[in-house]
Structures are given as C-alpha cells and as structure tokens.
C-alpha cells in the first residue's frame, strides 16, 4: 500500500478545486433549468383538456410574440381531453416529436390524480427522456387546482386535495432531473379558494337565495380497479367569476394561470416607459422613442414607438387583474406625466378613447396595458384572432394529417400554418401610436374637466 502525504496548503488547494468544480456544476445545472427563447424556437405545449381549451396557452403565446417581436417563434398546441402521462407517451411521435420542437412543456395531473402517484412520476420521467432524445428542452408545469372553494389544508374535493402531493412530487422530480418546473397549483389554490369563499360571504350578507352549484368536474377515466372518488362538497359562488367550470376556467381564470406560469418562467415584465412634463418636454424614454411632443390648446400630444408591445390581455379577462394585481408586473407599459394640476384627463390613442385618469394616476405612472378599449384593444383582438386560427383549425388539420401519416395533407397544413404565422409576425411588429391627453389643467392650470 502506498501512502501519499500532502501538505496543508496542498489539501487546501485541492479543496478549493473541488468546491470550484461543484460550483461550476451547480451553475451549469442552474443554466439548464432556465427557459430562454431564441429565434426559430418551436414550443409544443402538451397537456390535457385544459391545454386543449387553447386559452392560457394562447395567452402565453401572445405574451412572447408581442414581447419579442423580432424573434420568429412557433407555438404548437398538443392538448387532448382526458389525457394522462401515458396518453401523451402513446401519441408522442406523431403529436409532439413530429412538430420538431426545441421546447416541450408538459402540463398534466388533473386526470393523473385518479391513479397512483408512482405511475404519474414514471410517466413524467419517461416523457423527459423522450423530449431530451428529440432533442428538445423539457418544461414541467403542474396542474392547476380545481376551482371548488378549496384552500390549502381545507380542501372541498378529494381531487383538488390530491393534486397537492402530486405537485410536490413533480417539483422534486424536476429538481432531480434538472428540468424547468412551474408550480401553478399552489399560487392559485388560495387565490381561487378565497375568491369562492368571499363570494359565499357576499351572498350571505345579501341574504340571497342563490342555490349552490354542485361540483361537476369533467369526467375522467378511472385507473383499472380504482374506486370512484368521494363526492365533493357544494361549490360556493365566486366573488370574481373565473368563467368556465371548476376544472376548465374561462378567460379570467386562464389569465390567472398564464400569469402564474409566466412568472414561474421568470418572464421579463418590462415593456417600456415614458415620462413627459406638463409643458410637453420628454423627461425620460426607456425602450421607446417619443417624438412630436407638444402642448397646444390644452392638449398634450406625442408619438410613441416602442421596441416591443404590452401583453395583450383580453378585455373579457380584465377582472383577472383585480383578482391578481401582480399580473401587471408582467407588462410594465408605463406613461407618466408630471406637473399636472388636479383634475381628470382624457387619454386617447390614435384618436380613440383609451382611459380617463386623474393627475395623481398619471404622475405615478399609468400602465397602458389596462387600456381595454380603443386602438390597443383593437390590435389585441386582431392578434388573438390569428392565434386562435393558428392553434384552432390549422393546428387540428396538421395534427390529423400527422396521425394519419398523410404527407400531402401534412404539407398543405404546414403551408397554411406558415402563412398564418407570417401574418401574425407582421402584426406584432412595433407601430407608432399617437397619444393625446386633455383636460384638468393642461395649458390652463386650475380649470377642471367638465
């Protein structure tokens, strides 16, 4: 046996080298567990019926397309109702891999909780391996909660309760596999549950006789030999309705989901900001250009050209911001006007009314994302319509042809998708907006808006 003697300084150098290696390895793993979109990325969003609704997934797509208009990004919906991990594995080749993705997100669990946790984790692990073999980057997204009035520790249905340990187990698996993971269950369960409970309190205070709606989550197949789950408790009304049903929220709930997922992906919240004085001078312009600024006839006007666009949140989902104000952190599209006299000011964009704000609101900074009427909303509606077309009939045609291995129909479907994407790419490019603000004391301090 050979004994090697080392000095204390040598041992310290070796220890430092080991620590440095460990640090580099950790940094590498941390880098692997991040999502950074690049030009020509193809993101396949695989999931169950909640993904197949094409709501929160479309909202996420709208965020990335408007925030990074110079990138050519491609999003592909791959959701099917009732799916579990095994279902996605069975259709993986023609419905996921066939898209030639660079990113694949897996959003499952709502149906998997009717089976054992081990099967869910094994399925997820197999999906990670398949995604990496394509090769593409896997992203794991937990199931959303059941909107039945459950909060942590006080669940109203066994189904919603069971998603909790499944989410914790998925988080652990993602850490072990060094995979990007987003937990939407825990940020949403108390938000939605308290919203239901506040709704019940409001009804009780008004002594309303509104009957409670029985819990009727979407039916799912039970695992072989599994017993039917216990019946859920009656569902109270929501203070702010999410739309849809307890398992499949509508636009408000789906906007909450999209916001939580984007926050979990550490999406950039800054769009642009501009500050002007009451005299029409440009004080600051960040990520935008301000031109033709002037004050004439009691009206402040200027032209604004942004580097990117705000998140086009649907007007039908504007109460999602009331329910989750942090949503606006993902779309900081700001206008400040300093030195205004007290009063109300009408703001228009491209000649269409956008908002009526007071001097304090404009001084603090108005987030223009909340202009749910006018020119910006017109653009948001147009973007949403094209994404709906892309992820609806065009997506369906492509997937049907892929499943049948019909090369001719697949080529035609691909051509249609590319044409729609070209139109969408043109639509999300920055455009100059003409802003006008009048009222209060612009040009004639002290005179209030009638």
Question: What residues fall within each predicted segment?
Answer:
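N-terminal secretory signal peptides that target proteins for export/translocation
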Residues: 1-10
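Bacterial N-terminal signal peptides
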Residues: 11-24
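Serine-esterase "nucleophile elbow" of acetyl-processing enzymes
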Residues: 30-81, 91-100, 257, 347, ...
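Conserved catalytic region of serine esterases and O-acyltransferases that act on ester linkages
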Residues: 38, 200-450
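Solvent-exposed loop/turn segments at secondary-structure junctions
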Residues: 49-52, 80-85, 110-115, 144-148, ...
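Oxyanion-hole/transition-state-stabilizing segment in secreted/luminal serine hydrolases
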Residues: 56-59, 63-66, 71, 85-121, ...
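Active-site segments of SGNH/GDSL-like serine hydrolases
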Residues: 107-111, 127-163, 184-187, 194
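Substrate-gating cap/lid alpha-helix
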Residues: 150-184, 210-211, 215, 227, ...
């Amino acid at each position: 046996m050979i004994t090697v003697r080392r000095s204390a300084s040598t041992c310290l150098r070796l220890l430092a080298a080991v620590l440095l290696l460990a640090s580099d390895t950790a940094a590498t793993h941390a880098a692997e567990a991040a999502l950074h979109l690049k030009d020509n990325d193809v993101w396949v969003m695989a999931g169950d019926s909640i993904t197949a609704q094409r709501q929160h997934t479309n909202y996420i797509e709208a965020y990335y397309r408007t925030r990074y208009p110079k990138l050519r990004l491609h999003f592909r919906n791959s959701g099917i109702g009732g799916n579990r991990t095994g279902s996605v594995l069975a259709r993986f080749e023609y419905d996921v891999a066939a898209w030639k993705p660079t990113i694949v997100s897996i959003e499952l669990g709502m149906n998997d909780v009717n089976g054992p946790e081990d099967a869910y984790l094994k399925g997820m692990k197999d999906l990670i391996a398949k995604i990496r073999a394509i090769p593409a980057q896997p992203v794991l997204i937990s199931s959303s909660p059941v909107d039945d009035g459950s909060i942590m520790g006080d669940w109203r249905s066994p189904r919603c309760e069971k998603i909790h340990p499944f989410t914790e187990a998925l988080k652990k698996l993602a850490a072990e596999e060094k995979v990007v993971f987003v937990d939407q269950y825990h940020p949403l369960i108390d938000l939605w549950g308290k919203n239901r409970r506040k709704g019940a309190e409001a009804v009780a205070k008004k002594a309303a006789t509104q009957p409670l709606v029985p819990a009727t989550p979407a039916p799912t197949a039970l695992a072989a030999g599994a017993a039917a789950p216990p019946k859920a408790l009656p569902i109270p009304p929501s203070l702010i309705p999410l739309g849809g049903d307890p398992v499949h929220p509508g636009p408000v709930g789906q906007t909450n989901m999209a916001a939580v997922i984007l926050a979990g992906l550490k999406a950039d919240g800054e769009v642009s900001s501009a500050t002007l004085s009451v005299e029409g001078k440009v004080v600051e312009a960040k990520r935008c250009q301000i031109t033709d600024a002037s004050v004439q006839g009691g009206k402040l006007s200027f032209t604004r050209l942004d580097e990117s666009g705000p998140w086009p949140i649907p007007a039908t989902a504007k109460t999602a911001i009331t329910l989750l104000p942090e949503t606006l952190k993902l779309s900081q599209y700001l206008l400040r006007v300093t030195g205004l006299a007290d009063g109300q000011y009408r703001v228009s964009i491209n000649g269409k009314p956008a908002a009526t704000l007071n001097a304090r609101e404009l001084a603090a900074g108005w987030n223009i994302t909340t202009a749910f009427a006018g020119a910006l909303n017109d653009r948001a509606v147009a973007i949403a319509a094209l994404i709906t077309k892309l992820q609806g009939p065009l997506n369906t045609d492509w997937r049907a042809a892929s499943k049948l291995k019909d090369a001719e129909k697949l080529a035609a479907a691909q051509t249609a998708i590319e044409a729609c994407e070209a139109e969408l790419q043109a639509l999300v490019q920055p455009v100059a907006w003409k802003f006008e603000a009048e009222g209060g004391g612009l040009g004639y301090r002290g005179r209030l808006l009638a």
